[in-house]
Amino acid sequence: MQAVDGISFSVKAGETLGVVGESGCGKSTMARCIMRLLDPTGGKVVFDGRDITNLSRAQMRPIRREMMMIFQDPYASLNARKRVGFIVAEALEVHKLGTDAEVKRRVQELLEVVGLNPEHYNRFPHEFSGGQRQRIGVARALAVNPKLIVCDEPVSALDVSVQAQILNLLKDLQEDFGLTYVFIAHDLNVVRHISDRVMVMYLGKVVELAERDRIYAEPKHPYTGALLSAVPIPNPEAGRLRKPVVLEGDVPSPINPPSACRFHPRCPRFHEGHCDVEEPPLYSFSNGHVAACHYPLERWPLTAEEFRTSRDGPTKAKATAEAEA
């Protein structure tokens, strides 16, 4: 079984790459492989020009200062038996970055940066709300001045109003500290708000990658189009006229994935004898926009009938070996 299979992408310094897809598509597994919390069974992970795939624990130690992670559940990701000061300071102490007084001062500065009272240094996690706990998680990730932060659905467990606060905080911190984010989510509105580029995954594969505005205005892969058609829009009249594309069935099991294109059992544009026989490469369209589909969407939006019919036949777009920036 391969939870993540043959994906290739790059992230530029200072940008935010949004990663979307249904539950079980491999987003979190990919994040843990990037962080070397899981060891990939093939391929390689390159960070800042260095292959870190097979580095030992001792060799990874200095690199771990430069890449941190914000976890999904603010209730489970903080040790309930430890005070906030200890939680945020742990990375500083592991890497021996300062005296006790300097560490305490740094932690209090970080709490203030993320919008919490520095005097709450000695409180326990249960004394904070969900949004405040996630701010503590952000402070912990910032403690050692990393270059890259992998955000694994950091707002999915929060109320909508609190989600906006955390997203705005992450954007402000990126501007202030020059951070690079890999931002994983299943909410397309959240991803649109924070991302520079968006990568869509399905059953362990990358099916589309493009600049944010381009992927929302001109999706090429039918799966991306189906996801976008389900996003609520604030115009009631337009919402009544639009008919979401309903995908039949559930995501297949990665233990026994479909042949060729993994989306073909649910795809409205499925062509028997092609989609189930030949796996589509990542076709390159323009401006770094790539999509893995033999019969891509010609324009957007489409009617339900147009969505199910490819008028141009198989794509003549150039295939690319990997999803490049």
Where are these regions (language model features)?
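Charged, flexible cofactor/metal-binding loops and thiol motifs
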Residues: 211-319
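ABC transporter nucleotide-binding domains
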Residues: 1-218, 229, 291-292, 297-325
